[in-house]
Swiss-Prot record:
Residues with site note (Interaction with substrate tRNA): 108, 130
Pfam families, per the entry: IPPT
Assembly and interaction partners: Monomer.
UniProt protein name: tRNA dimethylallyltransferase
GO biological process, one term: tRNA modification
Cofactor needs: Mg(2+)
PANTHER family with a match to the protein in the record: TRNA DIMETHYLALLYLTRANSFERASE (PTHR11088:SF60)
Length: 316
């Protein structure tokens, strides 16, 4: 939206960036200087009992800057972009009513997109249709279903790996329910966000620095008890790798290790690689993002000053 169309709207701030880029530290610093309240935009931080492997803000950090939308789901539960949009809008309205500015911080870019642009009118999940797809997969295999999706919706099929049953079944389910492809329906936008948003992205200047930060943080997680945390989840017996919670980077690789499918060193290597792949996807999203102010995570003081400078230059 242009400045003209956002005139008179309440203000909001987006602080985006790849994993391990220093978003939380900057958000906490801004909380000390501005009338902001924080909302987490992270599909992993919603889960209770998944603290170390998700790099959830510590108790000390949360005391300085409480985050909304943390610990709102059990790991056995799913949480959609539509649910995030609904919940975030409620939190943003409450913060605005209190005379403060919502500061949304995190790296789940799909959530930001859903919030900014609204959601496409996708049909709700249908257990009967999903069961039929599962049955087809049991008989013919997921690769056969992927070939079927290639015929129905080649654009979606090109994006979805044959070994990703969750996304594959959803793409087929949408078509079987609505008669329209996922690609067709996602071109239809929903309601635009009724806020004047200032958007910032913080990231290291080079890919090597991102990789270095990710490796350091993964080893820190292990030293802080990540394996014990994952073992407690594994021991529950009701969680598995098809669930969004256990598909989170680090947890999926730890699950394979705990199941005896891989050794410790391989788990560490795969966990770091998966986190690097996540950061790469996040950076791909961000490079195509409009109206974003870039910040260098290697210069936190300059990043902090830049945010204050941009915000003070805005009218209102």
């Amino acid at each position: 939206m242009s400045e003209q169309t956002t005139a008179g709207l309440p203000k909001a701030i987006f602080l985006m960036g790849p994993t391990a880029s220093g978003k939380t530290a900057l958000a906490i610093a801004l909380r000390q200087a501005l009338p902001v309240e924080l909302i987490s935009v992270d599909s992993a931080l919603i889960y209770r009992g998944m603290d170390i492997g998700t790099a959830k803000p510590s108790a000390e950090e949360l005391a300085l800057a409480p985050h909304r939308l943390l610990d709102i789901r059990d790991p056995s539960e799913a949480y959609s972009a539509a649910e995030f949009r609904r919940d975030a809008l409620v939190e943003m309205a409450e913060i605005t009513r209190r005379g403060n500015i919502p500061l949304l911080v995190g790296g789940t870019m799909l959530y930001y997109k859903a919030l900014l642009e609204g959601l496409s009118p996708l049909p709700s999940a249908d257990p009967e249709v999903r069961q039929r797809i599962e049955q087809m997969a049991g008989e013919a295999g997921w690769e056969a279903l992927h070939r079927q999706l290639c015929d129905i919706d080649p654009v979606a099929a090109n994006r979805i790996h044959p070994n990703d049953p969750q996304r594959l079944s959803r793409a087929l389910e949408v078509f079987f329910i609505s008669g329209k492809t996922l690609t067709e329906l996602t071109k239809i936008s929903g309601e635009i966000l009724p806020y004047d948003v200032s958007q910032f992205a913080i990231a290291p200047a080079s890919r090597e620095l991102i990789h270095q930060r990710i490796e350091q943080r993964f080893h820190q997680m292990l030293a802080s008890g990540f394996e014990a945390e994952a073992r407690a989840l594994f021991a529950r017996g009701d969680l598995h790798t098809e669930m969004p919670s256990i598909r989170c980077v680090g947890y999926r690789q730890m699950w394979s290790y705990l199941a005896g499918e891989t050794d410790y060193d391989d788990m560490v290597y795969r966990g770091i690689c998966a986190t690097r792949q996540l950061a790469k996807r996040q950076m791909t999203w961000l490079r195509g993002w409009k109206d974003v102010h870039w910040l260098d995570s290697e210069q936190p003081d300059a990043a902090y000053s830049r945010v204050l400078q941009v915000l003070s230059a805005k009218p209102g």
